[in-house]
């Protein structure tokens, strides 16, 4: 034992004894006895003077006192005791590593690691002593000790030369030792050597070189160490790494003669092709050997030798991925010096039979062909490595390499292996080209085919998973291709953008993507080295939460880098052509994704858009003098996305809009914005993982600080204000694009987009609506989108935008809406109402529509001899007429219609005349056809006629409307021959009803008398001749002026106008003495009522009516009572024509005397009410019509209440409810009138007309219901019996309501009649 201890370097006796004691009895607990501690302390104290590893002072100061020295000795004693305890504890833990279970082993290793960080030298000494004291320990125990020693050496800051030599010798002795643990035992020993290299790699490298150049093929462990050293990035500094690589090259040069040694060459090839425990990962020894082989071939001067070795290598199996990568690396390294030879070998190998069989056109003949299945992948990787390693001479070869790669891509079996090989090779090729000087002076003609392969590859990527870097690699390659000459054509570039956007943006949500991706990822390979791991005591934790968490983190990183690759590609494209056209081209492919219905697609698209704008804003690549193209569309889309429900989309949209604002300001001022740091003028080359120049990580890493936020106030504004400020910087064309974008957004199915589009449209019109030039197409588009807007607030804002737009573009909007108003639907009508929401605009809309009515083309042969009208013009005219009709009912146009009544009134009458002109026959026709042609179709004249009716009714002139409606005079407006009579009746009604609009209409029609259009002059003279009877005429047109106007009419080209002017000149207004003459003719005319001829009587009654009209304000005087009495006597005449004429004359008399209070006439009116009421059911339609009209006129004279309701009832109501209302109006006036009316009704019970008898019976029935006593006091027995018989007869009436009423009245009558009279 003493001998052993004396031979140990820097070994201390106490530690040795403790080690011996522990080794002799493994069951002793870690704490040692007190005696042992004392003995150890003495030994340690004796040897402490010659040790340099202790940290306490070795010199005793002589001037210290005895007590100070005693204290120092006590401290040293405690320190030595602590070290001894630590050594003993470590020794015991090293011993327990042999039998510890996995969990205890993990605990021991952790404790030793902590000790090594505090005192690595002590731990190394303890482990060394343990090896010396226990030479027969098991291989598994040694394996664990090697691992521990590797950890301790790595934790040590300095490794002393003695320990370095000792552990180097220990490693070299065990690296080649064969044990039951196989390779993992050797690798553990080799890793010790690697750990020593951290402190002194040159010494280790010298050992390795010596072993490598012996002429005997080196052992696997030696290659393992060299492989680890070559692949590690942490062992060497940059300078040492270069030295190591240079030393490898020198080793390769010295190894060239070995290529001629058959045994060495075969051993090399066998080692390279022997399958490993796993082919998923390349072992360090194989990875180094492929590199070393390539360096040797690179150093070989004989090209034939190089070809022979490469051919032999390629003829081995290509089944495993790492094998293919290694072959490609060897070929690439050889190509650095032997490019022609390598190219020839690859070309020959590509044409060989195994390769041809591996293509899809030929199926494998047997299972051995499986080793050739992925040979195409090897070739692809080889071309990539050739380009990467021989980049100094590669430019002339690029097109050839690309053509070969494209060929193998298209004609090889498609799988993940081929795809990844193709991408890897292409990345290496693009890297070599980009790093080659003079690449920009070359033109590469195969880039478009390579780009097509990339697009095919991305389209084949599964759309629901993201497991690989294929997408980002393909986009990085595309970014590099964009820099080469010649530039990519627009069509291919468009395909590239569409493919990339679809492949990235259309990926599912991250949660769904994570779920799908984790299912596709391979679980940990628990079969890796199963026997060796089991023997070594290794464990596997399984596929648990940590693995899932790793999957999530991996996916997040993969997704982020994929998005960054897309952003980098967009930045590369804009850098190659930094123009506004190129920016618009790129953004135009983004718009479809910015408008996606899926939130995550919008979020991704707007993020890429924001990154691109931020890149341009911070680097100022675009020329400030160049105008943006269609930037308004981008502003509109970003503005809508600022209202996106997704918060991330909102933020990106707002930030993108802010950067866009700064770009616009830059272009406006003509000064490029500068980045915080100096902006590069070219995109920097992507690093190994392809990070873009400006990406989302940069955004997160450098957020806008408070100072920059304060400087760039735009980033502090809300989205509404940002978009509003941007609008201020847009040109007119850009504003139009923005508005068009907003209009398109109205048709979206996303509620938020519709709402945002309406707000933006309203804002744009509010701020800049007056500047817009052409709004017709915009208005049409709004109409198309309006039907799909179901959000009330959005529709309201859209219509409000139309209202604001109409302030400056009324005529254009009216013309546009006219073109889409046939047929008129609710959405178009809403637009018309929006036009009139402003009072000034509503007047202008009506004026514009009236101006449209002036375009009245006539067919050939019409009175104006105008050319044949175009169909479009006629439809426009019809639409204007229809809108004038519909807008009268719109609340927004109520005031405008009221104020524009005179113009509308004359225009509608003129339009009706025009429509009737269109329906005149153009040539002589048979009698029946002529009659049909003379009657216009309902569509031709109904619109203007209905518009006139609604004008009268909606503006408060319903009295005038009632006059024509109750007479059924609207039919007069349907033929050209009766049209003048209809206009005359309407004008007469206005005069009789004292219409307030007569002065205004007069002022409006006077200019029409001078119109070049005959129809306008005709309408004006028709109305003027009737207005001559109005008292207010002289307020507008003095008598002399009226005479002048009528005299001028005598010279009018139109015969009709001349006749009407002549009739006007004969008016009593100009001949006052004519009144007495006409009054004197009334008595003889009344005597003529008793002529024998019916026609004569009717004609005389008509003459009397005309005389009453011509007398005008003078009236008939006292003769009115006689006219009334004479006329009433014919109400019950058996002759229909005479009854009708009598009622008409009575009505004219009542109207003529309406302003005069004659008690006798009022009595006649009271007495005529029941007959008129009963004749409402007259069998003769003419009599019934005249009865209605006269009844209404009498009610007006008597000043009944609810006249409008009375008119509506007379005009349109039917049934018992109408009869009840008329009875109520008649019988509730006064007791005197009640008696008169009831007496008259009772007298009609004896009528020979069944209709009259039925009608009066119902009338009396209503009276009995409400005034039974008053009725029965006036009934005699005959009248009562007659009532019973009549009600009994009505019980069988065909009308159910009358039968029901008769039954109830009969029962009631029986009960009342049975009561005794009081």
Swiss-Prot record:
Q: Which Pfam families match?
A: HEAT_Maestro, HEAT_Maestro_2, HEAT_MROH2B_C
Disordered: annotated segments:
1-38, 676-695
Q: Which SUPFAM superfamilies match?
A: ARM repeat
HEAT repeat start-end pairs: 581-618, 769-811, 840-880, 996-1033, 1037-1074, 1076-1113, 1118-1155, 1164-1200, 1278-1315
User: Per the record, GO CC terms?
Assistant: cytoplasm
Question: Which residue intervals are annotated with compositional bias (Polar residues) in the record?
Answer: 12-38
InterPro entries, per this entry?
ARM-like (IPR011989), ARM-type_fold (IPR016024), HEAT_Maestro (IPR055406), HEAT_MROH2B-like (IPR055408), Maestro-like_HEAT (IPR048465), Maestro_heat-like_prot (IPR045206)
Transmembrane stretches in the record are none
Is Repeat one of the keywords? Answer: yes
The chain's disulfide connectivity reads none
Q: Which UniProt keywords apply?
A: Repeat
Protein name, entry field: Maestro heat-like repeat family member 5
Taxonomic lineage is:
Eukaryota, Metazoa, Chordata, Craniata, Vertebrata
């Amino acid at each position: 034992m003493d001998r052993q201890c004396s031979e140990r370097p820097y070994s201390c006796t106490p530690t040795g004894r403790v080690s011996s004691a522990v080794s002799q009895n493994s069951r002793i607990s870690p704490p040692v006895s007190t005696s042992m501690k004392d003995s150890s302390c003495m030994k340690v104290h004796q040897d402490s003077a010659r040790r340099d590893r202790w940290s306490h002072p070795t010199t005793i100061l002589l001037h210290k006192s005895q007590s100070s020295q005693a204290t120092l000795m006590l401290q040293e004693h405690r320190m030595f005791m602590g070290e001894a305890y630590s050594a003993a504890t470590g020794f015991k833990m090293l011993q327990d590593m042999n039998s510890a279970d996995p969990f205890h082993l993990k605990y021991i290793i952790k404790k030793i690691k902590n000790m090594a960080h505090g005192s690595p030298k002590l731990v190394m000494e303890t482990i060394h002593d343990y090896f010396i004291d226990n030479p027969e320990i098991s291989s598994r125990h040694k394996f664990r000790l090697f691992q521990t020693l590797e950890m301790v050496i790595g934790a040590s800051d300095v490794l002393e030369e003695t320990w370095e030599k000792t552990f180097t010798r220990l490693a070299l002795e065990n690296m080649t030792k064969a044990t039951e643990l196989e390779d993992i035992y050797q690798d553990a020993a080799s890793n010790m050597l690697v750990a020593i290299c951290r402190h002194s790699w040159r010494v280790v490298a010298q050992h390795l070189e010596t072993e490598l150049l012996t002429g005997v093929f080196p052992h696997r462990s030696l290659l393992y160490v060299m492989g680890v050293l070559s692949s590690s990035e942490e062992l060497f500094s940059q300078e040492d790494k270069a030295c190591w690589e240079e030393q490898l090259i020198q080793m390769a040069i010295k190894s060239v003669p070995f290529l001629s040694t058959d045994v060495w060459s075969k051993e090399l090839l066998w080692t390279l092709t022997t399958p490993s425990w796993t082919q998923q990962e390349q072992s360090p020894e194989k990875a180094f050997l492929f590199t070393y082989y390539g360096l040797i071939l690179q150093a070989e001067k004989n090209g034939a030798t190089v070809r022979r070795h490469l051919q032999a290598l390629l003829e081995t199996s290509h089944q495993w991925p790492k094998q293919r990568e290694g072959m490609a690396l060897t070929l690439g390294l050889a190509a650095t010096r032997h490019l022609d030879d390598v190219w020839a070998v690859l070309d020959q190998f590509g044409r060989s039979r195994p390769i041809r069989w591996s293509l899809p056109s030929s199926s494998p003949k047997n299972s051995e062909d499986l080793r050739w299945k992925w040979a195409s992948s090897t070739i692809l990787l080889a071309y990539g490595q050739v380009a990467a390693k021989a980049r100094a001479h590669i430019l002339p070869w690029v097109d050839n390499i690309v053509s070969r790669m494209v060929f193998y891509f298209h004609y090889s079996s498609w799988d993940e292996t081929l795809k990844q090989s193709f991408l890897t090779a292409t990345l290496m090729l693009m890297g070599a080209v980009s790093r080659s000087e003079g690449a920009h002076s070359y033109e590469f003609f195969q880039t478009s085919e390579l780009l097509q392969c990339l697009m095919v590859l991305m389209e084949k990527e599964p759309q629901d998973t993201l497991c690989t870097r294929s997408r980002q690699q393909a986009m990085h390659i595309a970014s590099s291709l964009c820099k080469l000459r010649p530039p990519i054509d627009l069509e291919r570039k468009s395909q590239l953008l569409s493919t990339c956007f679809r492949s990235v943006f259309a990926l599912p949500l991250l949660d769904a993507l994570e779920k799908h991706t984790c299912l596709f990822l391979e679980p940990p390979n628990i079969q890796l080295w199963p026997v060796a791991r089991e023997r070594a005591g290794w464990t596997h934790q399984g596929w648990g939460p940590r693995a899932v968490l790793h999957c999530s983190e991996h996916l997040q990183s993969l997704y982020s880098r994929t998005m960054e690759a897309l952003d980098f590609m967009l930045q590369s494209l804009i850098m190659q052509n930094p123009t506004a056209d190129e920016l618009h081209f790129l953004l135009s492919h983004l718009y479809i994704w910015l408008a996606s219905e899926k939130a995550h697609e919008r979020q991704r698209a707007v993020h890429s858009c924001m990154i691109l704008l931020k890149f341009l804003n911070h680097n100022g690549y675009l020329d400030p003098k160049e105008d943006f193209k269609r930037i308004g569309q981008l502003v509109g889309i970003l503005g809508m996305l600022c209202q996106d429900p997704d918060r991330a989309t909102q933020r990106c949209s707002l930030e993108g809009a802010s950067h866009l604002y700064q770009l616009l300001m830059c272009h406006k001022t003509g000064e490029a914005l500068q980045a915080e740091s100096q902006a590069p003028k070219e995109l920097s080359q992507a690093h190994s993982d392809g990070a873009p120049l400006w990406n989302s990580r940069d955004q997160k890493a450098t957020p806008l600080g408070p100072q920059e936020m304060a400087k760039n106030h735009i980033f502090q504004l809300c989205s509404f204000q940002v978009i509003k400020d941007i609008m201020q910087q847009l040109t007119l064309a850009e504003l139009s694009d923005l508005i068009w974008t907003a209009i398109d957004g109205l048709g979206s199915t996303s509620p938020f987009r519709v709402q945002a589009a309406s707000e933006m449209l309203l804002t744009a019109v509010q701020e800049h609506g007056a500047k817009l030039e052409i709004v017709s197409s915009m208005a049409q588009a709004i109409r198309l989108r309006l039907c799909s807007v179901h959000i009330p607030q959005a529709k309201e804002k859209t219509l409000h935008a139309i209202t604001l737009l109409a302030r400056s573009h009324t005529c254009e909007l009216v013309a546009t809406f006219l073109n889409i108003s046939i047929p008129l639907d609710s959405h178009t009508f809403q637009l018309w109402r929006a036009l009139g929401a402003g009072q000034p605009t509503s007047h202008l809309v009506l004026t514009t529509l009236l101006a449209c009515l002036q375009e009245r083309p006539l067919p050939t042969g019409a009175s104006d001899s105008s050319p044949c009208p175009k169909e479009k013009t006629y439809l426009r005219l019809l639409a204007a007429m229809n809108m004038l009709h519909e807008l009268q009912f719109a609340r927004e146009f109520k005031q405008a219609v009221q104020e524009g009544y005179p113009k509308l009134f004359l225009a509608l009458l003129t339009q009706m005349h025009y429509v009737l002109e269109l329906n005149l026959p153009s040539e002589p026709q048979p009698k029946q056809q002529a009659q049909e042609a003379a009657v216009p179709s309902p569509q031709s004249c109904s619109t203007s006629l209905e518009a006139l009716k609604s004008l009268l009714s909606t503006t408060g002139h319903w009295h005038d409307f009632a006059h024509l409606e109750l007479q059924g005079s609207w039919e007069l407006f349907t033929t050209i021959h009766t049209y003048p009579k209809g206009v005359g009746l309407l004008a007469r009604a206005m005069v009789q009803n004292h219409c307030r609009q007569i002065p205004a209409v007069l002022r409006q029609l006077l200019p029409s008398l001078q119109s070049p259009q005959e129809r306008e002059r005709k309408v004006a003279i028709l109305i003027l001749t009737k207005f001559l009877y109005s008292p207010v005429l002289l307020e507008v047109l003095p008598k002399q002026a009226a005479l002048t106007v009528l005299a001028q009419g005598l010279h009018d080209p139109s015969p009709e106008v001349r006749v009407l002017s002549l009739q006007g000149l004969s008016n009593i207004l100009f001949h006052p003495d004519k009144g007495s003459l006409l009054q004197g003719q009334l008595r003889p005319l009344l005597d003529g009522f008793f002529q024998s001829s019916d026609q004569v009587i009717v004609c005389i009654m008509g003459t009397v009516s005309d005389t009453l009209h011509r007398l005008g304000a003078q009236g008939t005087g006292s003769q009115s009572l006689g006219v009334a009495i004479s006329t009433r006597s014919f109400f019950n005449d058996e002759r229909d024509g005479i009854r009708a004429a009598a009622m008409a004359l009575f009505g004219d008399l009542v109207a003529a005397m309406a302003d005069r209070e004659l008690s006798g006439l009022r009595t006649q009116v009271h007495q005529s009410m029941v007959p008129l009421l009963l004749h409402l059911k007259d069998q003769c339609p003419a009599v019934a019509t005249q009865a209605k009209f006269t009844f209404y006129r009498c009610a007006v004279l008597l000043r009944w209440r609810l006249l409008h309701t009375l008119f509506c009832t007379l005009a349109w109501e039917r049934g018992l409810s109408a009869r009840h209302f008329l009875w109520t109006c008649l019988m509730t006036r006064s007791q005197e009138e009640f008696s008169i009316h009831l007496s008259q009704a009772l007298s009609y019970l004896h009528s020979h007309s069944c209709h009259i008898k039925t009608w009066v019976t119902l009338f009396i029935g209503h009276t009995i219901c409400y005034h039974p006593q008053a009725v029965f006091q006036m009934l005699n027995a005959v009248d009562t019996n007659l009532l019973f018989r009549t009600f009994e007869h009505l019980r069988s009436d065909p009308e159910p309501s009358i039968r029901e009423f008769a039954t109830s009245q009969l029962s009631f009558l029986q009960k009342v009649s049975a009561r005794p009279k009081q």
